[in-house]
Amino acid sequence: MDALATSINQFALELSQKLAESAQGKNIFFSAWSISASLAMVHLGAKGNTAAQMAQVLQFKRDQGVKSDPESEKKRKMEFNLSNSGEIHCNFQTLISEILKPNNDYILKTANATYSEKTYPFHNKYLEDVKTYFGAEPQSVNFVEASDQIRKEINSWVERQTEGKIQNLLSDDSVDSTTRMVLVNALYFKGIWEHQFLVQHTTEKPFRINETTSKPVQMMFMKEKLQIFHIEKPQALGLQLYYKSRDLSLFILLPEDINGLEQLEKAITYEKLNEWTSADMMEVYHVQLHLPKFKLEESYDLKSTLSSMGMRDAFSESKADFSGMSSARNLFLSNVFHKAFVEIDEQGTEAAAGSGSEISFRMKVPSIEFNANHPFLFFIRHNKTNNILFYGRFCSP
């Protein structure tokens, strides 16, 4: 499972860089873990070149095109037989079960499904495997005659699965009578902080988008002992903020320079991120933390992005090979839709009660100010599995 987490986290960084290219100056927020799990359901029925390309993009085959030293690559090959499709999907089964375990300290609602035109019936073996490994049931629907009705039904299902938080995942023109197969993936997250911010300390402050432009935000504030890490190249400050029970953490990577976000994004690799956020790099400080209160709801049509990353054949009517899914010819993936929703506020969740803690700085621990008043990167990690659940960029309030 460790190696699967490595693959998913590497995919998160690759995908973030691709999304950043087409979203300059815009916020980014997505769940690489959830997208990976959804695509793995499709990979389960892929064969030949189609399967190989998907495995490469999803970093299941980490021996090609990965920037890392030979020793670490050798170690990864030893710990995970990446050519073994069965092992990959067994690991997903374990991972999904671990991450989605019922928990009173955070809400994580997912909606993952594959919808295929009914004239392309699924193999029984494929249906059984998807249910076993992913707890999902691919749906055969009538895109040819009732595409808009199907779109509305999909949106209603996603809304129910996410308790009303994710609405209208599929836009009016997202599917039509020529649609063969679509993958829908939506995720809603809300957690309770270990140390909550006091509402009375939240004030309006300027958020500096660049050196000349700023926008007002509701800036939260707390004084607390927190874990800080320093990044030297490019210069940035990192912070770990635990959610209650410490199952999850929010990491913030704040460039020293107001205009330093792009440089930081380009510098990040899987190995560097692992190094920066390792326990050895963490130091406890008395932190005066200023963090914007924000809500992000981002939607993505991932077809062009995934194609540009190398997953081309899956979207091609003439080249796609999903013979492990259906015996019908010309079945291909029409699109992959993803939507993720997160709220960052004082308590961390609407239902949280009680007051936050405030400390006086008397112990011999160094003090530092962490003022997230300009663009930063952030991600939410499931600590037990070391999985990046969400990855984001906040640069435009």
UniProtKB/Swiss-Prot annotation:
Sequence intervals crossing the membrane: none
PROSITE patterns named in the record: SERPIN
Record organism: Callithrix jacchus (White-tufted-ear marmoset)
Chain ranges for the short sequence motif Nuclear localization signal as given in the UniProt record: 74-77
Purpose of the protein: Protease inhibitor that may play a role in the regulation of protease activities during hematopoiesis and apoptosis induced by TNF. May regulate protease activities in the cytoplasm and in the nucleus.
Gene Ontology molecular function: serine-type endopeptidase inhibitor activity
Localization, UniProt: Nucleus; Cytoplasm
PANTHER family: SERINE PROTEASE INHIBITOR, SERPIN, SERPIN B10
Keywords: Cytoplasm, Nucleus, Protease inhibitor, Serine protease inhibitor
The family this protein is said to belong to: Belongs to the serpin family. Ov-serpin subfamily.
Any single Pfam family the record assigns to this protein: Serpin
Disulfide pattern: none
Gene name of this polypeptide: SERPINB10
Main location: nucleus
Keyword Cytoplasm in annotation: yes
UniProt xrefs under Gene3D superfamilies: Alpha-1-antitrypsin, domain 1, Antithrombin, subunit I, domain 2
InterPro entries cross-referenced by the UniProt entry: Serpin_CS, Serpin_dom, Serpin_fam, Serpin_sf, Serpin_sf_1, Serpin_sf_2
GO cellular component: cytoplasm; extracellular space; nucleus
Name of the protein in question: Serpin B10
Residues at the site labelled Reactive bond: R362, M363
